[in-house]
Amino acid sequence: MVTQNKKILIITGSFGNGHMQVTQSIVNQLNDMNLDHLSVIEHDLFMEAHPILTSICKKWYINSFKYFRNMYKGFYYSRPDKLDKCFYKYYGLNKLINLLIKEKPDLILLTFPTPVMSVLTEQFNINIPVATVMTDYRLHKNWITPYSTRYYVATKETKQDFIDVGIDPSTVKVTGIPIDNKFETPINQKQWLIDNNLDPDKQTILMSAGAFGVSKGFDTMITDILAKSANAQVVMICGKSKELKRSLIAKFKSNENVLILGYTKHMNEWMASSQLMITKPGGITITEGFARCIPMIFLNPAPGQELENALYFEEKGFGKIADTPEEAIKIVASLTNGNEQLTNMISTMEQDKIKYATQTICRDLLDLIGHSSQPQEIYGKVPLYARFFVK
């Protein structure tokens, strides 16, 4: 219980929506706990520190999944010593120092890989608990902050990854990845499908087209899935691509086994009401799917965290990787045509999923903050440190 005024500073990043969604889930949960003495502030560190350069980097990051895969692969799989020498380790340093001086937080929570935090924790005993929520299923060096108080990770295998690189096991908690609480609540699947003019007795294949950032080839995929999966219907989420939505509606407007949607706030309901999902393996998307126990097909995952997530889910029996649309269609047909494998995958997910990650993490954060004291050392040392590095 927080009985004195305390402040949590959340450092996040807007590279993709996942990190922001995790942050919002935690903020909402803490707000729901009605803690009068707790204030929570969040900052998109890189965007605030270097808005123009970060905007360029974000565009490159998004396009790297389509056009610069080898370049991103080289960055992601670089040796740790190369990352240590990269300017990225110091990116946002001045802004971070100023935030700590201004806000004087009692706890820092990272929901985005923030190597610059390591610069502070390695140079100073800042006496501020630092906790990290890791939003992927395999460890990458950028998630490690020396002298951290806590790491919240998705699985016991992820914890072992941390232990293998020398992290104290007592600092790593297997909590699952925090998602919106609505993914934990029951859904009347039959009624949802009926309300959307779909047949609850058919197997529903959910396709998230917006996740792929492309607008071609989905008409053929839908046609082939329906041709090879006799008892299937397809729900296509087009995201913000109005062109894709228009073209698919025109092609399938008379087909009662196809529903074309644009951007939707009802992914929870669709995941809960579908038997199989074709998507990209972003950490939050697949965690939401995991919570709803919907097996997934990962179409041509990009090297890096996407591929690592997909490999883990395939290894655990939660999903399958398809390198091409044709391979994805074959997998759909195999899983939906009376194959027990789909039922077994769902059963495995039911057994392995971790519930209520957000609540678990928030309770532990409150415990950490209850034992923290207002730091003093950093406020004397940081101004000199800032002048040394930033000028």
Swiss-Prot record:
Can the keyword Membrane be found in this entry's annotation? Answer: yes
Which EC class heads this enzyme's classification? transferase
Annotated compartments: Cell membrane
Pfam families according to UniProt: Glyco_tran_28_C, MGDG_synth
Output the superkingdom of the source species.
Bacteria
Q: In which pathway does it act?
A: Glycolipid metabolism; diglucosyl-diacylglycerol biosynthesis
- Its EC number is 2.4.1.315
- What is this enzyme's catalytic activity, as reactions? a 1,2-diacyl-3-O-(beta-D-glucopyranosyl)-sn-glycerol + UDP-alpha-D-glucose = a 1,2-diacyl-3-O-(beta-D-Glc-(1->6)-beta-D-Glc)-sn-glycerol + UDP + H(+); a 1,2-diacyl-sn-glycerol + UDP-alpha-D-glucose = a 1,2-diacyl-3-O-(beta-D-glucopyranosyl)-sn-glycerol + UDP + H(+)
What GO biological process terms does the UniProt entry carry, in alphabetical order?
enterobacterial common antigen biosynthetic process; glycolipid biosynthetic process; lipoteichoic acid biosynthetic process
Q: Which GO terms describe its cellular component?
A: plasma membrane
Q: List the disulfide bonds.
A: none
By its UniProt entry, which PANTHER family does this protein fall under? MONOGALACTOSYLDIACYLGLYCEROL SYNTHASE (PTHR43025), MONOGALACTOSYLDIACYLGLYCEROL SYNTHASE 1, CHLOROPLASTIC (PTHR43025:SF3)
- What function does the entry list? Processive glucosyltransferase involved in the biosynthesis of both the bilayer- and non-bilayer-forming membrane glucolipids. Is able to successively transfer two glucosyl residues to diacylglycerol (DAG), thereby catalyzing the formation of beta-monoglucosyl-DAG (3-O-(beta-D-glucopyranosyl)-1,2-diacyl-sn-glycerol) and beta-diglucosyl-DAG (3-O-(beta-D-glucopyranosyl-beta-(1->6)-D-glucopyranosyl)-1,2-diacyl-sn-glycerol). Beta-diglucosyl-DAG is the predominant glycolipid found in Bacillales and is also used as a membrane anchor for lipoteichoic acid (LTA).
The protein's name is Processive diacylglycerol beta-glucosyltransferase
Q: Which organism is it from?
A: Staphylococcus aureus (strain JH9)
Q: Which gene encodes it?
A: ugtP
